From Swiss-Prot:
Lineage of the organism: Eukaryota, Metazoa, Ecdysozoa, Arthropoda, Hexapoda
GO BP, one annotated term: proton transmembrane transport
Primary location group: mitochondrion
Residues annotated as transmembrane: 7-27
UniProt record similarity statement: Belongs to the ATPase protein 8 family.
Gene: mt:ATPase8
Protein name: ATP synthase protein 8
Amino acid sequence: MPQMMPMKWFLIYFIYLLIFYLFIMLINSMLIKTKINKETLKIKLKKWNWFW
């Protein structure tokens, strides 16, 4: 049993890293989308301010 423990922990750690990496990828894609949206929002706001 003690010899099996490190392997188990390694697997848990590996799965955790994989999930974390996927989560970072997801956040990055979301940030890119929001950046594009923010740029369009800024342009809209500038037009709106200019109109006022």
